[in-house]
Each structure stands twice: as structure tokens, then as C-alpha cells.
């Protein structure tokens, strides 16, 4: 329970005594380059570029770079159509993975701030302004934006939306201490001067915040900088994605452990990530221990509760396959799925497999195709229904709950 409830409680207490305010300046407009990582994104790259061009930021202070990692579809041709509007294509023939692609793309770029994004993430119109308003504070080296999932009403989609609301809560609590642990790969900004070459098997949104913090700069969360992304639909896609993230996280920790040292950042990593990742492998162990100690009333109670919880998760899986969904079964189903993925990830890591190339979830692209990201979708942010009325390109009909 510590990793889910105890750690947030510790952050709340620390925030009362160690809170460090950020000096904001709404008029601050540094030179910004938005880097979009892509691999075979012909279905949505046009909408992404249109969304990026429509962002509210001075055009003479803003450039868009599309870093294409071995794309063999029409992605590069579509991007070239926008070169007359200032979009820069950096196309690399050989696929080497996201980190290698970003390293090559950043070479020679002259800017004050780099913003990293993916093709399937659509920014709210003021997202860049909200990110950089934190940068006049010279203590700040990295700013993490808010990812909001557009739910497809599947168990997996709703579960992921719930998970990211929890992650956003942690980001907000850590931000009070100017020490957000990890970035959000679809929307985060780093000072150009603080960018360092990315390690092949390590996620950029894990490595860059860690290295920025190790150099004495703060990492903060900006809830006003919003990116919308469609959640996955299929179990196998989300399972594979979670497994990949955890493997890369473990790889990153091994490669960057000196950056964490033995101080607060190490405490954060253990509390927020490492313990959580090990919950999956420990659940079967806990089940077996309780089974062997049924004569103990406390162990018997836990054993019964475990069986009830797993039964609810199985019921949720069965009902999902039958097209029936229950909110009551969502949490057990998603919890078991995520921890099964963490178990698989640790096995993968121990066996020595590393995942340098990113494999996109196809259903996160399906809703964009021929629709300009304007199907009747919902973003789960709270309980109240509001009609989305923003002017952001490709998002006109988006409905969300806030």
C-alpha cells in the first residue's frame, strides 16, 4: 500500500514544509523547437502537423521538426508538403529506435527550449505558452505537461485514464518540491543547453528529467500544458506497452543510477516506481504464503480477500470479452493486468532483452484516420460533462469530462 497511498502522503507532508514556488512569466517567449518523433505515421501525421501549426505561439520564435525513424510509408512525403510552412523533416533511412532518432534530430538545432512530442498527441492551443512560462525561473530545467487520455469506453481505455489521473496527482505533489521524477513523453520541455545524448534503451522522458535534476535544476509539472491522446482499446496493446515501459525504466535506472545518488531522487524512484514494478512478481508469492498459513486468522482473511479481488478481475475480463462493462470491476481488472505486465517486464529484463524501438498501439491511431481527431470521444478528467469548444485544430468536436 505504501507505493500507492503512503508515498503521496509523504509528498503532501514534505510539501507543507519544503514547498518551492516557481516564478512564472506569461509574457516569456523563448525560441522553441517542437520535436515530433514518428515511425510510419501516415494516418495521423497531417493532423498532428496542423495541430502544431495552429498553436498559439509567436511564429518567429517557434519551429517544428519531424524526426522520422526509418519510416517506409507516406509519412515523409506528407511532412514535405509542409516544408513551405516552415516544418523541418529530419528523415533517417535506417530504423534505430526513438533515442537514436532524437539524438540525430537535435544535432545542430539552435533554440532555447526543446519540446518533445509524439504523432498521436494533440496539444491544446496554449500548451507551449504554458510550458515555457515556467522557464524564466533560472532554477527550472525541465517542465512536464499534462497528458489527458481520450477514452474509447473500453476497460483498458478507462483504466489507463484512471491511471494517468493518479500519475498527474503525483506529478503535482512532486512539483511542489521542484522534483518531478519522470516526464510525460508526449509533452515535456527541456532547456536546449541541458539536453545530453540519449542512451539507446532508455526512454527520453525518464533520462532527461533525471539528468537535469542531477545538474541541480528543478523539474516541475505544468497542469495547464495539456496534450490529448487516444487511449488503447485492446488488452494486448496496453499489456505490451506497459511491459515495454517497465523494461525501459529498469534499464534506465541501471544506466542512470549515479544520477539518482543516494538522496531524495533515489527515494522518489524507489517509492514511485521500483516498489510498484515489483508488486506484480510479489502478488503470487503473497498468495502462496497466505495459502500455507491458513491456520492463522489474519492470513486466512487476506487469502479470502485476495480470492474475492481476483474473482472480480476475472469476472471483469469475461464480461469485457462479452461486450459488457462494469465500473465496479474496472479497478480489479486493470490492477491485475498492469501487475501481470510488470511481472512479464521483470522476466524480460532478467533474461537480458532490451527494447530500443518503440511499437505504437494501432488503436491509438484509428480514431484519427479520416476524422481529423474529431470522433465523438470523451476525455476522462473528472465527473462533469462539458462540451469542448476550443479552437484547436483537429479537436473541434472533442467532448471531455472535467
Residue ranges and their predicted role:
Residues 43-47, 72-81:
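Acidic helix N-cap motif at the loop->helix transition within catalytic regions
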Residues 99-101, 105-107, 117, 125-202, ...:
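Long helical/loop segments within the catalytic core of UDP-sugar-dependent glycosyltransferases
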Residues 114:
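Short aromatic/hydrophobic "clamp" motif used to bind/position activated sugar donors
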Residues 135-166, 200, 204-270, 340, ...:
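Catalytic donor/gating beta->alpha subdomain of glycosyltransferases that bind UDP-sugars
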Amino acid at each position: 500500500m505504501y507505493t500507492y497511498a503512503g508515498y503521496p502522503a509523504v509528498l503532501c507532508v514534505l510539501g507543507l514544509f519544503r514547498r518551492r514556488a516557481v516564478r512564472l512569466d506569461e509574457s516569456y517567449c523563448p525560441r522553441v523547437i517542437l520535436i515530433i518523433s514518428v515511425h510510419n505515421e501516415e494516418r495521423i501525421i497531417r493532423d498532428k502537423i496542423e495541430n502544431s501549426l495552429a498553436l498559439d505561439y509567436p511564429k518567429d520564435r517557434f519551429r517544428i521538426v519531424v524526426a522520422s525513424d526509418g519510416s517506409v510509408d507516406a509519412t515523409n512525403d506528407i511532412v514535405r508538403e509542409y516544408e513551405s510552412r516552415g516544418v523541418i523533416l529530419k528523415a533517417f533511412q535506417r530504423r534505430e529506435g526513438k533515442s537514436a532518432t532524437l539524438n540525430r534530430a537535435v544535432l545542430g538545432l539552435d533554440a532555447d527550449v526543446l519540446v518533445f512530442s509524439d504523432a498521436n498527441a494533440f496539444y491544446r492551443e496554449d500548451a507551449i505558452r504554458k510550458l515555457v512560462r515556467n522557464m524564466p525561473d533560472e532554477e527550472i530545467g525541465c517542465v512536464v505537461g499534462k497528458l489527458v487520455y481520450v477514452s474509447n469506453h473500453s476497460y483498458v481505455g478507462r483504466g489507463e485514464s484512471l491511471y494517468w489521473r493518479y500519475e498527474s496527482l503525483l506529478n503535482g505533489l512532486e512539483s511542489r518540491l521542484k522534483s518531478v521524477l519522470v516526464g510525460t513523453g508526449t509533452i515535456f520541455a527541456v532547456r536546449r543547453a541541458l539536453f545530453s545524448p540519449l542512451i539507446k534503451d532508455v526512454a527520453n522522458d525518464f533520462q532527461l528529467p533525471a539528468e537535469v535534476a542531477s545538474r541541480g535544476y528543478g523539474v516541475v509539472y505544468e497542469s495547464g500544458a495539456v496534450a490529448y491522446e487516444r487511449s488503447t482499446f485492446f488488452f494486448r496493446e496496453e499489456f505490451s506497452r506497459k511491459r515495454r515501459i517497465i523494461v525501459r525504466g529498469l534499464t534506465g535506472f541501471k544506466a542512470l543510477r549515479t544520477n539518482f545518488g543516494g538522496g531524495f531522487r533515489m527515494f522518489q524512484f524507489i517509492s514511485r516506481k521500483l516498489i510498484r514494478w515489483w508488486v506484480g512478481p510479489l502478488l503470487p508469492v503473497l498468495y502462496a504464503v497466505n495459502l500455507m498459513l491458513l491456520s492463522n486468522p489474519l492470513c486466512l482473511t487476506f487469502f479470502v480477500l485476495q480470492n474475492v479481488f481476483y474473482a472480480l478481475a476475472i469476472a471483469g475480463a469475461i464480461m469485457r470479452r462479452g461486450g459488457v462493462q462494469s465500473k465496479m470491476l474496472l479497478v480489479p481488472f486493470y490492477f491485475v493486468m498492469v501487475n501481470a505486465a510488470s511481472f512479464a517486464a521483470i522476466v524480460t529484463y532478467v533474461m537480458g532483452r532490451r527494447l530500443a524501438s518503440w511499437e505504437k498501439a494501432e488503436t491509438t491511431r484509428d480514431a484519427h484516420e479520416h476524422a481529423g481527431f474529431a470522433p465523438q470521444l470523451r476525455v476522462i478528467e473528472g465527473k462533469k460533462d462539458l462540451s469542448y469548444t476550443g479552437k484547436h485544430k483537429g479537436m473541434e468536436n472533442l467532448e471531455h469530462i472535467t
